[in-house]
Amino acid sequence: MVDPVEARDRLIVALDLPDVRAAEAMIARLDDSVTFYKIGYQLAYAGGLPLARALKAAGKKVFVDLKLHDIGNTVARGVESLASLGATFITVHAYPQTMKAAVEGRGASKVKILAVTVLTSYDEADLAQAGYRLGVRDLVELRARQAKELGIDGLVCSPEEAAHLRGIVGDGIKLVTPGIRPAGSAAGDQKRIMTPARAIAAGADYLVVGRPVTEAADPKAAADAIVDEIVGATT
């Protein structure tokens, strides 16, 4: 069985914002509607990593999404440093050596390591252009099996693949899905997308949502609406 998670905790809002001040303003607007935030490249490189500690101190959860991929020692030490921020989730690319190093670097910390299978902005043509012989579905499945064998805690995958992956990895691995777009939202640069309710029904444990919340006229109302969809899909 998947650990029970409150509906509100299953929404992760991506703070893809230009600086810490903008992120803090968004967090204040969202108030108690959001309990889980993601810090990615844009905010991290603008000095946003210390915000992870502040969010944890405020009782929030933090997903530091830097998709580590380097030589083993560098990945292991990077995981060690990110774990010290108090992050709940961190990401690595789903290459076997990278995943193995990340698990070793975690040590005794409680941080959960998520492996990114194939970016949700990629489709079959993108993989072919990059020289991959496998299509999206086959590559995602291969990486999911490898991740499970190496002790990875969760997978970042398209909601389109969630149901298939759940059958492969079982209930012990968390499925975290970006590419979430509420009905009527623009797809933007995402190609493999799904609504919140459909993603939960497909087996996703956590939904990562950025622009549909942070660029909404009323971000708090947008977040609440997504949580309502999650509740509806789980009752």
Curated annotation (Swiss-Prot):
A GO molecular-function descriptor: orotidine-5'-phosphate decarboxylase activity
Gene Ontology BP terms: 'de novo' pyrimidine nucleobase biosynthetic process; 'de novo' UMP biosynthetic process
PANTHER family: OROTIDINE 5'-PHOSPHATE DECARBOXYLASE
Subunit structure comment from the entry: Homodimer.
Primary gene name: pyrF
HAMAP family the record matches: OMPdecase_type1_B (MF_01200_B)
EC annotation from Swiss-Prot or TrEMBL: 4.1.1.23
Family, similarity comment: Belongs to the OMP decarboxylase family. Type 1 subfamily.
Catalytic residue positions: K67
Protein origin, superkingdom: Bacteria
GO cellular component: cytosol
Pathway of action: Pyrimidine metabolism; UMP biosynthesis via de novo pathway; UMP from orotate: step 2/2
Cited SMART domains: OMPdecase
Entry keyword Repeat: no
Name of this protein: Orotidine 5'-phosphate decarboxylase
Protein's job: Catalyzes the decarboxylation of orotidine 5'-monophosphate (OMP) to uridine 5'-monophosphate (UMP).
Organism this protein belongs to: Rhodopseudomonas palustris (strain BisA53)
Reactions performed catalytically: orotidine 5'-phosphate + H(+) = UMP + CO2
Sorted UniProt keywords: Decarboxylase, Lyase, Pyrimidine biosynthesis
Chain sites annotated for binding substrate: 16, 38, 65-74, 120, 181, 190, 210-211
A UniProt-annotated Pfam family: OMPdecase
Main enzyme class: lyase
